Structure formats: structure tokens, C-alpha cells
Amino acid sequence: MEFKIDEQTLNDLELFNQALDGKSIFSCFNTACSDGGKACIRKMLESPLTDVNKIRERAEAIRYLGQLPFFLDIRREELSFIEVYLQQEDVPQRSMYHLTSRAVKGWLKPDNDCYLRQRAVPYLGRLIRELGTFMDELSVGKVPEMIRDMQQRVKETLAREGMQYLMSQKKDSFWTRESLDLYFRGRELDGVRVILDTLYMLDSLRSLGTMAKDEGLTFPIFTGSERRVRIEGLYHLFLENPVKNDV
């Protein structure tokens, strides 16, 4: 069940609307590198979890990624370029004639669509490879359940035909990019979305974990004995010298 915060409560809590000093809760935690990662953080605030198990899993994932000594190289401009590329309306046809004629036209007289493909496809291919490598480098037995689920989804996605074709390519060429475009915007489009959505979620969780570590914030401790909240040392992030209180 999804819990949606109403507009009045959002304003009262100053989650998104800036206070007099120009700050909001969202601005404090909005440290993700990618636009997709920022969108994930915003959604977390707009629709908070209500299931204690899901809350625990997310907290464990945030803590884990925040302490991880290595991470993905998030290239915001490349990701934005990829998103524009995926929104092209002319979905390529899977025929040798169409592919050949389009490749020849692009080679002899490249237009804007060709330029977009030729730039975005290598960006996307590199991103897919890097995410696969990153997931493989995580120790399966020590990662939180939420991260393990992501690993499994990425593994299943990379096992698909189009992704295997990408992995098998040793050299980058004009023809290879045109061929990969058939997969990326065709039969593997949903797989590409899995890759991007996973990257954005990892980016958001990592940024929250890093922010918590840098600011000295603590993570909740869950107990199964009773349903109540107890907070020690609560203070307002916006104040320079806040007085801590127990609630």
C-alpha cells in the first residue's frame, strides 16, 4: 500500500518548499549526481514507506552504499543524452534492408537523428558494462537484500540477447552502433529501462548514505516488541547551533 503525503502536510513540513533561509528538507538530501537519482529521492519523500520491513531494507541499503569504498562513475550529461535518445519516436525496424539503408544514409549524409544515435549508443553501452561490472564486484553474501534484488534483476537483464550482443562486441564502429540501436530502442528497451532505473536508485541510495555519514546522522534501530518511535538527540538540520532533544 502506497502512502501519499497531501499538499498541506508537504508545505507544513517544508519538504520541498523553501524556508526563509532558502532551504528545504529535499534540498538537504538532494545530493544525487543524476537527474534520475534526484527524482528517486523526491519520490521517497512524497510517498514514504509504511511497511517496517521495507523501511529496514532501504535503511540497510543506504548505509551499505554510503560506506562502500568504490562506486559507479555517474556522468549526468551522458545520462541526459541517453534519455533524449530513448525518446526518439522513429523506432528502428529489424530488417537488413532498413538497417543498411539507414547506415549508408547516416554515413554519407548524417542528420541530427544519426548524430544522436552515434553519440548515445556508446554512452549507453559503456553504462551497461560498468553497471554489470559494479554489481559483480559486490560480495553477494554481504550485501543487503534490496541490493541483492537489484543484482538479480541486472543479471537477468544482461543475459538477454541484445545485451549479450553488446558484451560480445570487441570494437566500436559505425555499423555496430547502428546494430545496437535496433536492440536498445527495440526489443531490449524494457531491459535498458531496468538498467537505467537501477542506476538511478543506486545513485540516490549512495548519495543519501554519503550525506548521512558526512553529517553524522544515525540510522533507525528496529524492534519487534512494540510499535512506537523513540528519538534521542533530535535536532533541526537548518539551525547552526541546534539544541538536541529526546522525543
Residues covered by each model-derived region:
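Generic recognition of flexible, low-complexity loop/linker segments
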Residues: 29-30, 188, 217-219
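Intracellular alpha-helical coupling/juxtamembrane segments of multi-pass membrane proteins
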Residues: 55, 150, 157, 181, ...
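Conserved amphipathic alpha-helical "coupling/scaffold" segments
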Residues: 1-161, 165, 198-201, 234
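Conserved NTPase motor "head" modules and their coupling/switch loops across ABC/AAA+ ATPases, GTPases
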Residues: 194-247
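Short, charged/polar, low-complexity loop and linker segments
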Residues: 100-109, 173-184
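Mixed-charge, polar/low-complexity N-terminal
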Residues: 8-9, 13-16, 20-22, 174, ...
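Low-complexity, intrinsically disordered or weakly predicted helical/coil tracts enriched
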Residues: 4-8, 192, 214-215
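Extended, charged coiled-coil "arm/hinge" scaffolds of SMC/Rad50-like chromosome-maintenance ATPases
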Residues: 155-181
